[in-house]
Amino acid sequence: MKTLLLTLVVVTIVCLDLGDSLICYLDFSVPHTCAPGEKLCYTRTWNDGRGTRIERGCAATCPIPKKPEIHVTCCSTDRCNPHPKQKPH
């Protein structure tokens, strides 16, 4: 009985720890589990000679654009940074 109780406690702790991880989109529509401490998803967009460029990922703090032509948005829920042409889940 003690073994069963201990097993349930361990499984609960592991599940609670996994549930704390944020999921953000990276390239294309590939979801990625962020590292501990990365509590934001971001989308960075800018234009270059080839058209509109899009970068997405995880961050501990919202990235600050280094140039005025770069636009950054941040959010804090799972899969909240889809490609701009897609709707969030």
UniProtKB/Swiss-Prot annotation:
This protein's GO cellular component annotations are:
extracellular region
Q: What else is known?
A: Has the length of long neurotoxins, but only 4 disulfide bonds, as short neurotoxins.
What is the annotated tissue distribution of the protein whose record heads this document? Expressed by the venom gland.
Family, similarity comment:
Belongs to the three-finger toxin family. Long-chain subfamily. Type II alpha-neurotoxin sub-subfamily.
Keywords, A to Z, come to:
Acetylcholine receptor inhibiting toxin, Disulfide bond, Ion channel impairing toxin, Neurotoxin, Postsynaptic neurotoxin, Secreted, Signal, Toxin
Where does the record place it? Secreted
Q: Where is the signal peptide, in residue numbers? A: 1-21
According to the lineage, what is the superkingdom? Eukaryota
Q: What is this protein called?
A: Long neurotoxin 1
Record-level Gene Ontology MF annotations:
acetylcholine receptor inhibitor activity; ion channel regulator activity; toxin activity
Known InterPro entries for this protein? Snake_3FTx, Snake_toxin-like_sf, Snake_toxin_con_site, Toxin_cobra-type
Relate the protein's function as given in its record: Binds with high affinity to muscular (alpha-1/CHRNA1) and neuronal (alpha-7/CHRNA7) nicotinic acetylcholine receptor (nAChR) and inhibits acetylcholine from binding to the receptor, thereby impairing neuromuscular and neuronal transmission.
Family matches, as SUPFAM superfamilies: Snake toxin-like
- Keyword NAD listed? The answer is no
Q: Pfam families from the entry?
A: Toxin_cobra-type
| Major location (coarse) | secreted
Q: Give me the disulphide-bonded residues.
A: 24-41, 34-58, 62-74, 75-80
